[in-house]
Design a protein with these regions (language model features):
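A conserved acidic beta->alpha catalytic loop
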Residues: 1-8, 24
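Alpha-helical elements of Rossmann-like donor-binding domains used by nucleotide-donor carbohydrate transfer enzymes
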Residues: 5, 9, 30, 34, ...
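Acidic metal-phosphate-binding loop of nucleotide-sugar-dependent transferases
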Residues: 26, 51-52, 78, 151
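Conserved donor NDP-sugar-binding/catalytic core segment of glycosyltransferases
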Residues: 52-102
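A short, conserved alpha-helix in the catalytic core of glycosyltransferases
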Residues: 121, 127-170
């Protein structure tokens, strides 16, 4: 449970926002699963609290999802907040799995972050989208049972994307 005044702040400043208070911190996967069960939407936008978005950032991705019903999850480029010319470590521009089962992503090789020179401005199929800023089709998400609650934090987005791919989604 939150130990700062963030819940009070939300209730006072944003009274129309439905605040979900869980009795304990069960982790990223369980927390999102519990929250998303209360949301009636075609798409979910999962956004970490430390991600800053730009104006009109949602529309192009919703247009992409609307254009192809086989797309289960996607993301925008995620750039480093402090060094905006470089990709962010967590997910950068979507990821893949190598032949040894190791996840990697566009915009980052191991701990080396690439400079954003527009090389990933194209819409391209990736194996997984980052949970830091993930758009996901609700129908596909629930067809695979949502996030696996065994993942407290990290790699849950790779797992759910893998399971959605296994049933025919991109």
């Amino acid at each position: 449970q939150s130990t700062d005044d963030s819940v009070l702040f939300l209730k006072e400043k944003f009274p129309d926002v439905n605040v979900i208070i869980n009795p304990s911190n069960e982790g990223f996967s369980t927390g999102y699963n519990l929250a998303l069960k209360q949301v009636n939407a075609e798409y979910y936008v999962l956004l970490n609290s430390d991600v800053e978005v730009t104006e009109n950032w949602i529309e192009p991705i919703i247009t992409l999802l609307d254009s192809n019903k086989k797309i289960a999850a996607c993301q925008p480029k995620v750039l480093d907040y402090n060094l905006r010319s470089r990709f962010e470590y967590a997910g950068a521009s979507g990821g893949f799995i190598d032949k040894y089962g190791y996840p990697y992503c566009r915009g980052r090789i191991f701990n080396v972050l690439e400079e954003d020179k527009g090389q990933y401005n194209n819409a391209e199929e990736v194996f997984w989208s980052t949970g830091a800023c993930m758009f996901v089709r609700a129908e596909a998400f629930w067809k695979v049972g949502g996030f696996d609650d065994d993942y407290f934090a990290h790699m849950e987005e790779i797992d759910v994307c893998w399971r959605m791919k296994n049933i025919g989604y991109q």
